[in-house]
């Protein structure tokens, strides 16, 4: 079994959502952790648990971030974490249970395994994954929206995300 050490400094979670039917708002979560277990030589053996702290949301606008922390969206006073627990990983996809605001649904996302490399700064082996996909926020009770007088709604229901996770490897 390979020992993986999560490297948050070289990892991130970014998202975007349609805004006013004409543009998009982007953001990130600053606090998260990924536990990874299994054999790096057998991707199907890997099991991961990602924990995201929704109160760490950052869209570069404090008023918007505070609204996103409110009960209209993440309700961070009552919901201090979101989790994704894998059930199956292969070279192209990851299937797992995503929990947001106490709602759990199985989701399938794209995954890109970036191989193993040696860090020239410290000689340590590292590996990384990029996971991306689309989440229907309404499935998780995040329903806030407003109708526009020109038609359509203020916010899209689908949130696109990309998460990049890097790990050092101890053999």
Swiss-Prot record:
Pfam families: YceI. Disulfide bonds: none annotated. It comes from the Bacteria. InterPro entries: Lipid/polyisoprenoid-bd_YceI, TTHA0802/YceI-like_sf. Signal peptide: none annotated. Belongs to the UPF0312 family. This is UPF0312 protein SERP2314. It comes from Staphylococcus epidermidis (strain ATCC 35984 / DSM 28319 / BCRC 17069 / CCUG 31568 / BM 3577 / RP62A).
């Amino acid at each position: 079994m390979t020992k993986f050490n999560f490297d948050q400094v070289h990892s991130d979670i970014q998202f975007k959502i349609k805004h006013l039917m004409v543009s998009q708002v982007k953001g990130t979560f600053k606090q998260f952790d990924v536990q990874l277990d299994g054999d790096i030589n057998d991707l199907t053996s890997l099991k991961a648990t990602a924990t995201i702290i929704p109160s760490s949301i950052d869209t570069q606008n404090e008023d918007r971030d505070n609204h996103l922390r409110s009960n209209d969206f993440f309700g961070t006073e009552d919901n201090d974490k979101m989790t994704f627990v894998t059930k199956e990983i292969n070279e192209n996809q990851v299937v797992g249970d995503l929990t947001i605001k106490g709602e759990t649904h199985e989701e399938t996302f794209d995954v890109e395994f970036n191989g193993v490399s040696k860090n020239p700064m410290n000689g340590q082996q590292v590996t990384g994954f990029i996971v991306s996909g689309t989440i229907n926020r309404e499935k998780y009770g995040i329903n806030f929206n407003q109708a526009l007088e020109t038609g359509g709604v203020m916010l899209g229901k689908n949130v696109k995300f990309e998460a990049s996770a890097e790990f050092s490897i101890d053999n």
